[in-house]
């Protein structure tokens, strides 16, 4: 028998018909997983009648990277409205910042309170 002509080659390639060379090649399609933005949380500072205003400004500068003017503005909001937003963060970061603020307030014997709220 002579060489096979292109018309006589089976669709899956040359072979003797016993399936040795009939390899099905396919593409595995994985469902796309959609990444979501994490939920964000506001860190809120609550007013009290005992924590010095300068301490509140210091906390805002130290833990929330606020300038003196920004910190003073937030401190006045807390003082006048009873609550102020220190920043918006992912849950873990917000929780960590609340802990840092509360620890420093306790070390300095201030009753300052911070909490988180879903944004």
UniProtKB/Swiss-Prot annotation:
NCBIfam families: PRK00033.1-2, PRK00033.1-5. It comes from Gluconobacter oxydans (strain 621H). The lineage of its organism: Bacteria, Pseudomonadati, Pseudomonadota, Alphaproteobacteria, Acetobacterales. Binds to the N-terminal domain of the chaperone ClpA. Belongs to the ClpS family. Coiled coil: none annotated. Signal peptide: none annotated. HAMAP family: ClpS. This is ATP-dependent Clp protease adapter protein ClpS. GO terms for biological process: protein catabolic process; proteolysis. Involved in the modulation of the specificity of the ClpAP-mediated ATP-dependent protein degradation. Residues 1-24 are annotated as: Disordered.
């Amino acid at each position: 028998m002579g060489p096979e002509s292109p018309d006589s080659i089976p669709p899956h390639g040359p072979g003797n018909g016993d399936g040795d060379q009939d390899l099905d090649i396919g593409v595995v399609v994985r469902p796309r997983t959609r990444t979501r933005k994490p939920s964000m949380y506001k860190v809120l500072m609550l007013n009290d009648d005992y924590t010095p205003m300068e301490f509140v400004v210091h906390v805002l500068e130290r833990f929330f990277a606020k300038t003196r003017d920004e910190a003073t503005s937030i401190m006045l909001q807390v003082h006048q409205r009873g609550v102020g937003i220190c920043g918006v963060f992912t849950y873990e970061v917000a929780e960590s910042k609340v802990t840092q603020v509360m620890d420093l307030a306790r070390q300095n014997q201030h009753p300052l309170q911070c909490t988180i709220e879903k944004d």
